[in-house]
A protein has these predicted regions:
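Short, hydrophobic/aromatic-rich segments at coil-to-beta transitions
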Residues: 30-38
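Amphipathic alpha-helical interaction segments
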Residues: 13, 29-30, 46, 86
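Hydrophobic/basic alpha-helical segments enriched in Actinobacteria
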Residues: 26, 38-41
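Conserved short-loop catalytic and cofactor-binding motifs
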Residues: 2, 35, 59-62
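Terminal, regulation- and interaction-focused segments at domain boundaries
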Residues: 1-28
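Beta-strand/loop substructures that line and gate deep hydrophobic ligand-binding cavities in soluble
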Residues: 41-96
Length: 96
């Protein structure tokens, strides 16, 4: 599955959040300047954060599992946390 989100956070901040979110549950699998990957028994997730026109960052999260798997719920939760970091009043409501 692939998920996308546009944020006002800097790419480096998004990757810091990814390390904090996925690093406690999954092992680091790949590190590149704008990309991080983590893997474990539940699957593999790749986070890409790249600057996009103006002051925005495009965040792409891809997993190697089908939708609604455990790793997909982790991916969606991560994007909700990125949104909350950029907008602290955002309330996370999903069951993930």
């Amino acid at each position: 599955m692939r998920y996308f989100h546009r944020t006002s956070l800097a790419p480096d901040r998004v990757l810091e959040l990814a390390a904090a979110h996925f690093g406690t549950r999954l092992a680091p699998a790949e590190e590149a300047p704008r990309r991080r990957a983590y893997s474990g028994t539940v699957g593999r997730v790749t986070v890409t954060a790249r600057p996009e026109g103006g002051h925005y960052t495009l965040v792409e999260v891809a997993t190697d599992q089908v939708g609604e798997s455990e790793i997909d719920r982790l991916a969606k939760r991560f994007l909700a946390e990125v949104h909350r970091e950029a907008e602290p009043t955002h309330e996370i409501r999903g069951a993930y």
